[in-house]
Amino acid sequence: TKIPRGTSDWNNYMSYYDSCYAMQDGNLILRGIANHTQKNDTAPYLTGGVYTKGKKLFTGGRVEIRAKLQAAKGAWPAIWMLPEKAEWPKGGEIDIMERLNHDRIAYQTTHSYYTHVLGIKDNPPHGGINKINPEEYNIYSVDIYPDSLVFAVNHRHTYTYPRIDTDKEGQFP
């Protein structure tokens, strides 16, 4: 399902225009383009994005994505997992991959009520980075266990986010 435009930083340029979406050689291609063609749309940029909400629920195991992401100033490609029912940030967010601009690294992050609302981001650390080759396809993964999330890029460990014993609310997504 195509992501509709919203008002958040991450979705304020989303569009339904076909120029932002393509299937080619078995690959889904999502584009971010300057808006020179949609005169009735005031957004300076148009981007394609997809939701898989309601299509697949992961309760454990490995989620792995192979993707090639071109660099551009202002680019913020991301692959996230959100809970099926709980609202953000109560239900948490698992960022399998985020990349900014021309970075040669990928960010992998765990967000939750604990990290976002309570602001506890270092006990345990809630994110890590790993090198990528931007000119190639890279493999981004998270292994979901009852007691931890284990992140990797190209089969190289990035970091592990453990479930810890705490009296604070919402530590583990």
Give the role of each language-model region:
Residues 1-173:
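GH16 jelly-roll
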